[in-house]
């Protein structure tokens, strides 16, 4: 969806609800520059993804791991609970 800054201003609260419900960003156009309105949840996920893929070495490692899992070559492990009492 793409709207003008004036339309965004008039409908800000419904737009905030919309991006949180459908997780589709809203493109806002203006003569002074364009912007995007997205949910905080989506923004956080996006910034985490950018952080993880910023390093070419880490990106390759993650993509290789995904490929292994999709090929059925992954090994399942139990997670260690750091708060569990030690025997």
UniProtKB/Swiss-Prot annotation:
<keyword id="KW-1277">Toxin-antitoxin system</keyword>
<comment type="subunit">
    <text>Forms a complex with YoeB which inhibits its toxin activity.</text>
</comment>
<protein>
    <recommendedName>
        <fullName>Antitoxin YefM</fullName>
    </recommendedName>
</protein>
<dbReference type="InterPro" id="IPR051405">
    <property type="entry name" value="phD/YefM_antitoxin"/>
</dbReference>
<comment type="similarity">
    <text>Belongs to the phD/YefM antitoxin family.</text>
</comment>
<dbReference type="GO" id="GO:0006355">
    <property type="term" value="P:regulation of DNA-templated transcription"/>
</dbReference>
<comment type="function">
    <text>Antitoxin component of a type II toxin-antitoxin (TA) system. A probable antitoxin for the putative mRNA interferase YeoB.</text>
</comment>
<dbReference type="Pfam" id="PF02604">
    <property type="entry name" value="PhdYeFM_antitox"/>
</dbReference>
<dbReference type="InterPro" id="IPR036165">
    <property type="entry name" value="YefM-like_sf"/>
</dbReference>
<dbReference type="GO" id="GO:0003700">
    <property type="term" value="F:DNA-binding transcription factor activity"/>
</dbReference>
<dbReference type="GO" id="GO:0043565">
    <property type="term" value="F:sequence-specific DNA binding"/>
</dbReference>
<dbReference type="InterPro" id="IPR006442">
    <property type="entry name" value="Antitoxin_Phd/YefM"/>
</dbReference>
């Amino acid at each position: 969806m793409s709207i003008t800054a004036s339309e965004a201003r008039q409908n800000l609260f419904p737009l905030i609800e919309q991006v949180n419900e459908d997780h589709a960003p809203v493109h806002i156009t203006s003569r002074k520059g364009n912007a995007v309105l997205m949910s905080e949840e989506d923004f956080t996920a996006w910034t985490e993804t950018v952080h993880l893929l910023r390093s070419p070495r880490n990106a390759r490692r993650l993509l290789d791991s995904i490929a292994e899992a999709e090929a059925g070559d992954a090994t399942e492990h139990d997670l260690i609970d750091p708060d569990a009492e030690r025997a």
